[in-house]
């Protein structure tokens, strides 16, 4: 397989994520991908719908208690939602943001993420020796201690009485939830070539990749539903047609799979606002293209934000139009014209997980509230870092649905 290596910017993550799936390469990457694949099996995803529904209900209760009928920046509370879901599904332990330990973990993961983004946009900090002399190194060291200790303590605790299980999952697996850490511990105790450090790296990678990216999608999609009230009404009707109006009826995996309009709206949000707006690769070999030859050992960047709005690929590219993702409208589109989850062998291993979480969130949110616009695409001040962000937040108004 050619050109599977990430480019040099990903080395900034090594002290945090080690040789996790995001940063590893070659045989190591292939081995880890094989070990991790069972964690995203259909039968495992079935079990996580309960987690998504419960945390969505908690999110809705928070909105109803504190934020009704007023403009609020949704990003901080959405970030807390994804932190809760990701910690429970990856570690089997929900980060309690009301405790000192939980608050330290939340602060560290956000601070370290911001530090990496700062470094990625400051060329003189790309050199390791200069970075280590900068004040950012002190922040990195402090935050890594918090994050690594948190994950390591859970690994040690779970290892004490861990019982191995058959990892050939099928639809009958319903009794026990299998968070990512359990899948990895099972691989360790069944001697599949993974140790505690590698387990920590993979769990931390999942937290890093899944927390901010999903939160970004949820934030921008919330704004788009508020702005486009016609689609908000249509999606709400789709949900009612499947679940009825009784909020006690929680969506199942099968219910969420039926929500095709909701999925198209999410896909269109990911086109307009890809959470990871730029991806990087390093060429292993010389590549010939119609524009010329790309030499070996060159860092190549793929600008998803621009590609997803390229008028040569998309009619009226800045328009929110979920019908683009109907099968009849996308079947002739180039395979790599739309890649919010990357593409090829190194695509996002958790993309089905992410889509399920996002659909469960909006299924619960739109049944409870009407979203009214405060910010619009025109008022946002976007910044492209490792994660796409709005500098001035994303404000929405929530009113109870009658």
Task: Provide a role label for each language-model segment.
Residues 2, 229-232, 351-388:
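Cytochrome P450 heme-binding "Cys pocket" and the immediately downstream C-terminal segment
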Residues 302-330:
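Conserved cytochrome P450 K-helix/beta-meander segment immediately N-terminal to the heme-binding cysteine loop
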Residues 17, 22, 38, 209, ...:
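Cytochrome P450 heme-thiolate "Cys pocket" and heme-binding signature region
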Residues 1-51, 55, 73-74, 78-87, ...:
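Cytochrome P450 substrate-recognition site 1
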């Amino acid at each position: 397989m050619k050109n599977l290596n990430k480019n040099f910017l990903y080395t900034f993550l090594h002290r945090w994520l080690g040789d996790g799936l995001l940063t590893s390469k070659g045989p190591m990457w292939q081995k880890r991908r094989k070990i991790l694949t069972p964690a995203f099996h259909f039968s495992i995803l079935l079990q996580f719908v309960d987690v998504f529904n419960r945390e969505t209900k908690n999110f809705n209760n928070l909105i109803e208690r504190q934020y009704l009928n007023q403009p609020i920046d949704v990003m901080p509370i959405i970030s807390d939602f994804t932190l809760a879901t990701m910690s429970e599904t990856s570690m089997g332990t929900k980060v309690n943001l009301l405790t000192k330990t939980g608050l330290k973990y939340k602060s560290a993961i956000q601070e370290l993420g911001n530090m990496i983004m700062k470094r990625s946009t400051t060329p003189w900090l790309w050199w390791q020796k200069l970075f280590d002399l900068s004040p950012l190194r002190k922040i990195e060291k402090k935050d890594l201690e918090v994050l690594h200790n948190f994950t390591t303590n859970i690994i040690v605790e779970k290892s004490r009485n861990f019982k191995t299980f058959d990892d050939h999952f099928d639809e009958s697996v319903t009794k026990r939830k299998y968070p990512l850490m359990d899948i990895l511990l099972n691989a360790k105790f069944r001697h599949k070539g993974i140790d505690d450090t590698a387990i920590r790296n993979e769990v931390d990678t999942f937290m890093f990749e899944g927390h901010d990216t999903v939160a970004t999608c949820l934030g921008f999609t919330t704004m788009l539903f508020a702005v486009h009230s016609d689609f908000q009404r249509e999606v709400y009707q789709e949900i009612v047609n499947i679940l009825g109006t009784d909020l006690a009826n929680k969506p199942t995996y099968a219910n969420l799979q039926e929500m095709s309009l909701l999925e198209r709206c999410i896909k269109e949000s990911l086109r307009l606002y890809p959470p990871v707006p730029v991806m990087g690769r390093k060429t292993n070999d010389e590549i010939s293209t119609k524009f010329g030859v790309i030499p070996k050992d060159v860092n190549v960047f793929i600008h998803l934000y621009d590609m997803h709005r390229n008028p040569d690929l998309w009619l009226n590219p800045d328009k929110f139009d979920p019908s683009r993702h109907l099968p009849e409208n996308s079947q002739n589109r180039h395979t790599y014209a739309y890649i919010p989850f990357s593409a090829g062998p190194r695509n996002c291993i958790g993309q089905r997980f992410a889509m399920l979480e996002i659909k469960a969130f909006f299924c619960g949110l739109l049944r409870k509230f009407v979203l009214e616009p405060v910010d619009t695409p025109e008022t946002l001040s976007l910044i492209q870092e490792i994660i796409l962000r709005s500098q001035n937040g994303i404000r929405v108004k929530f009113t109870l649905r009658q």
